[in-house]
């Protein structure tokens, strides 16, 4: 609980001051005020700090933070770099708990790196003997659904979710919040964009979210860390409590150079990062899409007991490539048990079909939904199967709605991990924007019901495999060393 108490005022501030607040459109002091007010933060505890303004957004402005009538938990700097030092001194004098610095031009600046580093050191000297802590500089700051805090360009969904995002990039947090909500129905409870991290760093937020009962999955985008041993120690502890999904920036030589000019971070050796993340038990991803895919798996299905996956689809070629994609990702498509195979042979016609795994029933199965239901029930009964995966295409007429109802009921009746892959094929129809819109409508329908759904076998298989690997890692922490070695030899991915 110590970490929660330490950072709670940052995510649940009782009073907020915005340095540089103004009514002038398109200035960041204006945009931050807009975002915070739009998020619903109470105006009576929101204080514009600007000696050149009498008010902002109808709220009285103060020339100095020392002049406001209550203690400030969070100050947000949207001011020029030349004003930062004195403003920080004012915050220390006023006993402000946290200062979030959007201001840039520090060690990340290519043209002024040495000067920027020196300025960062001076900022640390200013807060050295105080309880004031810095988020940033060069970071967007904090989003907190319950704390009603936000920043410019941020998407504000009407509901929150059990996910947090720790990011060195501000722009990626804005992109992820919007994309994750639209495509995956993932929403965030808390986000922090911490930029150069001269004071508080990724490890502090990781420790906080590990203890936060509102957070079920932790997402991270990091380019580098100041204190590697401390970070990986915190990471090892966090993954014992909840999944931590890490997207590491700067993996290539060119990407590593880019991190230096983005946040002033040294990205470090990619191979060392890969090994260290694996040893810590983190789930490593390589894109925003993959981050969403894996997060969605953790939120929507119970932990699979193993890798064995039953596939129900249509088409011989599709069955072949689906199996290739599934096993290439690390999952397994085993043969069904003899008794289940016998039951399948009684149901599935023997022309143009197959009853191995995948089950290929050709397209007529979508017109015999009683058979479709029985096939799912048989897959569910097979003790060898851990995961049920159904793939289907956008259908004709009311077939989509009927199929959805059958799949929804089947999912409610199984305790196994249950996944749908929605393919784009138009069959005899020309693929048009209208057909893609229909596919999106179906996708959202499944998402709204809490069903795990992907748009390709590759994305589904990859996400689920990484989920299984995480839970296997947790299991192996309790097992003898020889069992751990045997597992690592079998699953080298």
Labelled PLM ranges:
Residues 1-493:
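Catalytic-core regions of core metabolic enzymes
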């Amino acid at each position: 609980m110590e970490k929660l108490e330490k950072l709670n005022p940052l995510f649940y501030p009782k009073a907020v001051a915005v340095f540089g607040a103004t009514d002038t459109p398109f200035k960041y002091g204006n945009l931050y005020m807009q975002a915070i007010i739009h998020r619903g933060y109470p105006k009576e505890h929101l204080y514009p700090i600007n000696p050149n303004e009498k008010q902002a957004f109808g709220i009285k402005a103060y020339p100095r933070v020392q002049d406001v009538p209550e203690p400030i938990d969070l100050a947000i700097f949207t001011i020029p770099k030349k004003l930062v030092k004195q403003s920080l001194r004012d915050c220390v004098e006023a006993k402000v708990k946290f200062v979030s610095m959007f201001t840039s031009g520090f060690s990340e600046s290519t043209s002024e790196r040495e000067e920027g580093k020196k300025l960062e050191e001076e900022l640390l000297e200013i807060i050295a003997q105080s309880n004031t802590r810095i988020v940033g500089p060069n970071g967007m700051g904090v989003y907190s659904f319950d704390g009603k805090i936000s920043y410019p360009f941020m998407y504000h969904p009407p509901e929150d979710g059990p996910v947090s995002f720790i990011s060195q990039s501000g722009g990626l947090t804005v992109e992820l919040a919007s994309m994750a909500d639209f495509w995956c129905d993932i929403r965030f409870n808390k986000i922090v964009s911490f930029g150069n991290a001269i004071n508080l760093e990724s490890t502090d937020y990781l420790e906080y979210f590990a203890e936060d009962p509102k957070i079920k999955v932790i997402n991270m985008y990091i380019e580098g860390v100041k204190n590697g041993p401390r970070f990986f120690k915190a990471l090892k502890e966090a993954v014992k409590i909840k999944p931590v999904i890490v997207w590491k920036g700067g993996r290539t030589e060119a990407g590593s150079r880019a991190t230096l000019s983005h946040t002033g971070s040294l990205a470090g050796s990619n191979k060392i990062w890969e090994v260290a993340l694996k040893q810590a038990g983190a789930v490593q991803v390589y894109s925003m899409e993959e981050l969403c895919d894996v997060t969605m798996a953790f939120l929507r299905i119970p932990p699979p007991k193993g890798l064995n996956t039953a596939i129900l689809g249509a088409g011989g070629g599709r069955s072949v490539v689906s199996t290739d994609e599934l096993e290439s990702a690390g999952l397994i498509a085993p043969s069904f048990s003899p008794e289940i195979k016998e039951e399948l042979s009684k149901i599935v016609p023997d022309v143009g079909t197959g009853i191995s795994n995948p089950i290929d029933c050709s397209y007529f199965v979508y017109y015999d939904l009683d058979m479709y239901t029985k096939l799912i029930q048989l897959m569910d009964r097979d003790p060898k199967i851990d995961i049920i995966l159904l793939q289907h295409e956008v259908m004709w007429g009311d077939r989509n709605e009927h199929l959805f109802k059958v799949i929804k009921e089947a999912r409610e009746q199984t305790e196994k991990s249950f996944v749908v892959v929605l393919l784009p094929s138009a069959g005899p129809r020309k693929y048009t924007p209208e057909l893609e819109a229909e596919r999106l409508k179906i996708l959202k329908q499944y998402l709204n019901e809490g069903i795990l759904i992907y748009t390709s076998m590759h994305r589904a298989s990859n996400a689920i495999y990484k989920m299984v690997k995480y839970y296997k890692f947790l299991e192996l922490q309790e097992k003898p060393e020889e069992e751990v070695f045997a597992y690592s030899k079998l699953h080298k991915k």
